[in-house]
Curated annotation (Swiss-Prot):
EC number: 3.6.4.-
Residues noted as binding ATP in the record, renumbered to the chain: 177-184
Family, per entry: Belongs to the SNF2/RAD54 helicase family. RapA subfamily.
GO biological process, one term: regulation of DNA-templated transcription
Domain (Helicase C-terminal) ranges: 473-627
Alphabetic keyword roster: Activator, ATP-binding, DNA-binding, Helicase, Hydrolase, Nucleotide-binding, Transcription, Transcription regulation
Residue ranges the record marks as coiled coil: none
Protein name: RNA polymerase-associated protein RapA
Motif DEAH box, residue numbers: 278-281
NCBIfam families (alphabetical): PRK04914.1
Gene3D superfamilies in the record: 2.30.30.140, 2.30.30.930, 3.30.360.80, 6.10.140.1500, 6.10.140.2230, P-loop containing nucleotide triphosphate hydrolases, Tandem AAA-ATPase domain
Ranges of residues in domain Helicase ATP-binding: 164-332
Gene: rapA
Amino acid sequence: MAQQYQPGQRWISDSEAELGLGTVLAQDGRLLTVLYPATGETRQYALRNAPLTRVRFSPGDVITHFENWKMTVREVDDVDGLLVYHGLNAQNELVTLPETQLSNFIQFRLATDRLFAGQIDQLSWFSLRYNTLEHTSRQLQSSLWGLGGVRAQPIAHQLHIAREVADRIAPRVLLADEVGLGKTIEAGLVIHRQLLSGRASRVLILVPENLQHQWLVEMRRRFNLQVALFDAERFMESDAGNPFEDTQLALVALEWLVEDEKAQDALFAAGWDLMVVDEAHHLVWHEDKASREYSLVEQLAEVIAGVLLLTATPEQLGQDSHFARLRLLDPNRFHDLKAFRAESENYRPVAQAVQELLDKGKLSAAAQETIHGFLGAEGDSLLAAVNTGDEEAKSRLIRELLDRHGTGRVLFRNTRAAVQGFPERKLHQYPLPCPVEYLELPVGEHADLYPEVSFQSHSDVSEEERWWRFDPRVDWLIDTLKMLKRVKVLVICAHAETAMDLEDALRVRSGIPATVFHEGMNILERDRAAAYFADEEFGAQVLICSEIGSEGRNFQFSHHLVLFDLPSHPDLLEQRIGRLDRIGQKHTIELHVPFLETSPQARLFQWYHEALNAFLNTCPTGNALQHQFGPRLLPLLESGDDDKWQTLINEARSERERLESELHTGRDRLLELNSGGAGEGEALVEAILDQDDQFSLPIYMETLFDAFGIDSEDHSENALILKPSEKMLDASFPLGDDEGVTITYDRNQALSREDMQFITWEHPMVQGGMDLVLSGSMGNTAVALIKNKALKPGTVLLELIYVSEVVAPRSLQLGRYLPPAALRCLLDPNGNDLASRVSFNTLNDQLESVPRASANKFIQAQRDQLTPRINAGEEKIMPKHAERVAEAQRRLAADTEEELARLTALQAVNPTVRDSELVALRTQREQGLAMLEKAALRLEAIRVLVAG
């Protein structure tokens, strides 16, 4: 007897019908491997419960050969477990077609099979299926797909960069925004949009070890991306041959990777579509030598098509270091440092001319001569129009110059000066007497920046002698919190021990409601603490964070920040302030800094305030100044030499002012315009906010929850609690937690309550729920009674829902041109299509349900009459399908031709346009047009309506 599965047999997936016809490749032990050639996907299933249905056609069925000729089946043979079909082709010739040669694009009329088998569903399920198809089609066509679902306020420059970069094939770019402008969010948006569109399916994220947790939190909380964090322990403990092959998104610390050659080999072997490198400016490169970290990233960049480098601004880095980043992206274009320097110098006068145009609205004779020399005669007409005040000509001139910018397509750099929306900062300093207990610490310890830690570690103290009972900063904190009453206050200190001690102090000494947040807590515990702090009515007044514990969190609903101590590096200070100082902060940031007089704390405060001006403004020069003056700074924090100290402060202040002046004069306004989007980002923001205000998603989700047996109840304003009910239909529904979850559709609520799921059309719960509806068969049949006086009792109407779709690899992004769309046909007894006159919702309002037994009895009695009418429906709907396909082909051809023309022209004046981009675009066009030619109609659902 033949085995159940044989290589070559054709099966269809019950849960992923969109994959097309599958072919059994192998049966290995308890695993079954099936290839889906239409999409290039391979799946492995457990042999005992594989969700597959055998494809077996019957006499009378019309089937298609992979070379696209058709035959009508007359006989079916089973030869060693494989089916062989015999029948007649279009020329009425006898032909044979083994199942191994069936077209991969054959569609199945499962709705018809279920209808005549008596599997008739509720009317609510039929409506849910139709609405799911409609929403899926709408979202796939949306320009916001992959941009609107992030848990963040929509910000113009971030959205512009994300769309511009994510819509490229294998993007290779440098994201170099100033601190606080959201490079991590930009990278997350690019990753998210590339994954949703299919342009990328495997992403590698390389970060410094101290940023791993921040990235993990950002990707999971903001984007719902399940990133796998790899370190030496996880890599060694994995049972897989190559642990990296088992994950779609890998987060890896560069420090570990450089030291582990086995991990490097596995990483290279795994294959990736996109690599993201954070803090790329720390990769050291010189003309004669590169660091191990740089060399490793360089080797990866050679084999990974898409590369995103997140880095400091070019002005901070210096030209040589900036060149080192660019050569990672395109070593052929950026191969000679001297040539790059010369090119940059040649371009500087053009950037200055644009600065003049933007500042004054017109161009001097010298600036016009500069632009003429850069654009040639073709720019003269634009210059003439600009001189008459033509705003459109001004925009076109800037675009022409940008297209010729040496790094305009690969570098995105926004500055705080160019981006609006940041709050002001106000500093409150509180010098306090240093307690004698700290002065009596062992020699050498009293100079510590964190004396409370030294006191606890060097003293065998009782509960009554703990440091927070005598430290004046604690008294000051209690008094300040009482003065601010119920105002939310964020406190940050360097160590987790200090944070926990402060919580104890507030509880014991004041009763002020407080919660703590540190690296020793897991993500769930941190979420609860953040939620307790965010709750306006019953929450904590104060949240006490350690340095590391607050990474990646956003507390901008608060605007009072207490720096209980000061960090040892200005970048860490900026990170602390950045918890509140973000775009969208509605209040002035109130910075409260208590410090102990005549201590290293006092001098460090003076260094940050007087030398670096780091409290009242961001300090882009802080890292350079710390590096330059650090060797002199640290000893003087401990020394009492006032003259040397004041000399250091004065020198550092002068150097900062000089560097800031260089940064300002070196600003490339043309590049800022490109990075900001010149209005395109604002349009995206408006569209996302409009989408947020619509009620279609909550209405749809309520019907989805009802269908699957998910109970929902009010939690608070704009929030719901979801729990699985006893009648839950499918345990695989992606609720996220078996015990239940709290959700909100409100973006502002989600930003302040990170314990709540932010539900958008892109959320895994929504996408997973919709997939369950469409991949299953529930709702593809229904029978109803229609109450309409215009219809004679007993009249039978037939409502047929077809899906017009193309089965193709997601990377081709054909969903933008031909998304799966529900085409509706409403046939009367005479074969007339009434769908254009009677909408789906209008019809629904006239229907009543029919008991299943009665419905089944009616269908069986009417089978012979219904079958030809169902077949006739496809003829009625085919012109609509053909029209959609033709329009999709036209749009695809037009879009790619326009982009090819633009890039080809651009390549002539800007070498950063790679040949590979043009080749990939042409290939994508040809493959896309060929796939659209195979687009098919599929009968998705049937509803039989009987007038009564």
